[in-house]
């Protein structure tokens, strides 16, 4: 039975060596492979105590991977789905809000690059940014700034 626990721990370390995982995500992955008598929660506690598993590192990693392509609401929604606590979400939201306009502008530039010539095209560009999770305020500011740059 001890060998199964080591196997489960080895599997957890292999997952964590590839990228950071949230406690909830890693627990879900390990539960699929757990045998009767394996205590996944105890293993997760052990990994957290040994600093192999960290919610804050996972949050930073996810924000870093997603920030260049997505808006605040999409990133925060994904963090929430991974079980990140509300206090951490509040801190992350405050950090993300400072550069949402710049990120929206960069995404717009990569996708479109030119200012919409008619209302239909403008609506299409705005919908694209909204689907990426950017706030209406950031989208409006990015579109206005793009229009000023074209003039």
Curated annotation (Swiss-Prot):
Q: Which domain of life is it from?
A: Bacteria
Q: List the disulfide bonds.
A: none
Q: Where in the cell is it found?
A: Cytoplasm
Q: Which InterPro entries does this one have?
A: RecX_HTH_1st (IPR053926), RecX_HTH_3rd (IPR053925), Regulatory_RecX (IPR003783), WH-like_DNA-bd_sf (IPR036388)
Q: Does the keyword Coiled coil apply?
A: no
Q: State a GO cellular component annotated for this protein.
A: cytoplasm
Ranges in a coiled coil: none
Cytoplasm: present as a keyword of the record?
Answer: yes
Per the entry, what this protein does is: Modulates RecA activity.
Name of the molecule in the record: Regulatory protein RecX
Q: Which organism is it from?
A: Janthinobacterium sp. (strain Marseille) (Minibacterium massiliensis)
């Amino acid at each position: 039975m001890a060998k199964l626990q080591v196997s489960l721990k080895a599997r957890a370390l292999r997952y964590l060596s590839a990228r950071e995982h949230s406690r909830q995500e890693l627990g879900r992955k390990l539960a699929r492979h757990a045998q009767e008598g394996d205590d996944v929660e105890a293993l997760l506690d052990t990994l957290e105590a040994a600093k192999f598993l960290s919610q804050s590192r996972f949050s930073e990693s996810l924000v870093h991977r997603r920030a260049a392509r997505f808006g605040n609401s999409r990133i925060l929604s994904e963090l929430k789905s991974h079980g990140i606590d509300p206090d951490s979400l509040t801190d992350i939201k405050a950090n993300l809000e400072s550069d949402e306009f710049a990120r929206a502008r960069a995404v717009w530039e990569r996708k479109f690059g030119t200012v919409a010539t008619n209302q239909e095209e403008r609506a299409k560009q705005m919908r694209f940014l909204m689907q990426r999770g950017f706030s209406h305020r950031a989208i409006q500011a990015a579109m206005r700034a793009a229009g000023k740059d074209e003039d």
